[in-house]
């Protein structure tokens, strides 16, 4: 596991083996889920087991969870090596790929951003609690240090 504060819950499906992969980027996404209450990050594993998608990590209000069994030798399917229909891909499309990027999913909430429980929202209308954002920042710092990832190589939500 990447850090003692991270829960290790490895996936056995929807991951690919790549021995000694080079990690250059950090991508942060959101789950578009119903809430960020404690335990939701761990529950996200079941979603990834059913879909042809995955992420290296997921965070909620309490937990940071690692789904990638071995960051040095496996990659998850989160960054979008293929363009979605009607999409031009992101700014780093074709540069930051599943093979060279670590992905973090932040559990989002449907609570309106005007609620006192939520202080962050994104352009798609999903909201994030301070606790979930703080866990994403904490995990990002751990990963950036461990893999020498410059802040210019980190995506935004």
Where in the sequence are the language-model features?
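Short, glycine/acidic-rich hinge or "gate" loops at secondary-structure transitions
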Residues: 149-157
């Amino acid at each position: 596991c990447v850090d003692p504060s991270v829960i290790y819950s490895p996936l056995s499906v929807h991951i690919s083996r790549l021995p000694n992969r080079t990690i250059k980027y950090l991508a942060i996404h959101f789950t578009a889920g119903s809430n960020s209450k404690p335990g939701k990050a761990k529950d996200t594993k079941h979603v990834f087991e059913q879909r042809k998608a995955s992420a290296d990590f997921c965070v909620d209000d309490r937990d940071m969870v690692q789904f990638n069994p071995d960051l040095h030798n496996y990659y998850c399917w989160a960054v979008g090596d293929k363009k979605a229909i009607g999409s031009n891909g992101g700014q780093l499309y074709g540069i930051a790929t599943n093979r060279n990027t670590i992905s973090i999913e932040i559990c989002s909430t449907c609570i309106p951003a005007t609620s006192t429980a939520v202080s962050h929202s994104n352009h798609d209308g999903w909201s994030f609690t301070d606790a979930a954002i703080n866990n994403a920042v904490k995990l990002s710092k751990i990963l950036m240090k461990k893999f020498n990832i410059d802040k210019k190589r980190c995506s935004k939500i």
